[in-house]
């Protein structure tokens, strides 16, 4: 049963990563600015004709950061038990949230205090992983597919299939995503 669940989780991850690889990334070079759009002549330059509208090819859509227009983030300890990294990711989704991303020192400090106060003595999954990365030392947030920019400088990720958990003191620790013995509670985030 555990092997079947692990295989299903790996298959789900491969499908999700495959889908996200096909999306172009957002950076200043590939975002079309308004002044770059072609200006086509029309019979009456105050309003475009149907031919003008058809002549302007639709621009590709880009994946924008998940917090594009969001003001506040709230962290919660997952309520659906413990599990593997992929189960934690799925559980957060089932709770209507995402697996936690840490995007500032302030968020890191908050989570450290939250975990110290919980005193469970357990690690907690967050959304950082190198699965799907071309360089094993590059982590991305599984929730947003954006690069992790808050990685502690001492953290040296060298193995493939690495996921990050927070220790009971809030420090980052490396864990093999595919090891069935790595079963932890998890931290979710939600925006409001």
Curated annotation (Swiss-Prot):
Induction field: Not induced by bacterial challenge in larvae.
Domain of life of the source: Eukaryota
CDD domains tied to this protein: CLECT
Start and end residues of each C-type lectin domain: 71-186
Disulphide bond pairs: 163-177
SMART domains, alphabetized: CLECT
Coiled coil: none
PROSITE patterns in the cross-refs: C_TYPE_LECTIN_2
A Pfam family: Lectin_C
Database matches in InterPro entries: C-type_lectin-like, C-type_lectin-like/link_sf, CTDL_fold
Extent of the signal sequence: 1-22
Biological processes annotated in GO: immune response
Bilayer-spanning residue ranges: none
Name assigned to this protein: Protein A16
